[in-house]
Amino acid sequence: MKTLSEIKEILRKHKKILKDKYKVKSIALFGSYARGEQTEESDIDIMVEFDENNYPSFSEYLELIEYLEKILGLKVDLITKKSIHNPYVKKSIEEDLIYV
């Protein structure tokens, strides 16, 4: 099982590709890994923000998920910052966020 530090380091090493190829403006972890409550079965919850003028297509978004799963070796649940509409869900996620 990967540690939070290992995951952050992997994401940092791939930051240029994430920005240049996948148009990621910012990336943050939340959920069980961010809270230190992960188990062997845990996936990793990631929130990304894209540049307003350079939003990826749906297929590019799916490619990003596949890329993250490949480099992390974990199942990834990916959301965008703009996709959180429920204020209670947003608050809960924001409490966990660890930006990379």
UniProtKB/Swiss-Prot annotation:
Motif, GSX(10)DXD motif: chain positions: 31-45
Amino acids binding Mg(2+) 2: D43, D45
Annotated Mg(2+) 1 binding sites: D43, D45, D77
Database matches in InterPro entries: NT_sf, Polymerase_NTP_transf_dom, Type-VII_TA_antitoxin
Cofactor note: Binds 2 Mg(2+) ions.
Subunit (UniProt): Probably forms a complex with cognate toxin MJ1380.
Function of the protein: Probable antitoxin component of a putative type VII toxin-antitoxin (TA) system. Neutralizes cognate toxic MJ1380 by di-AMPylation.
Name used for this protein in its record: Putative protein adenylyltransferase MJ1379
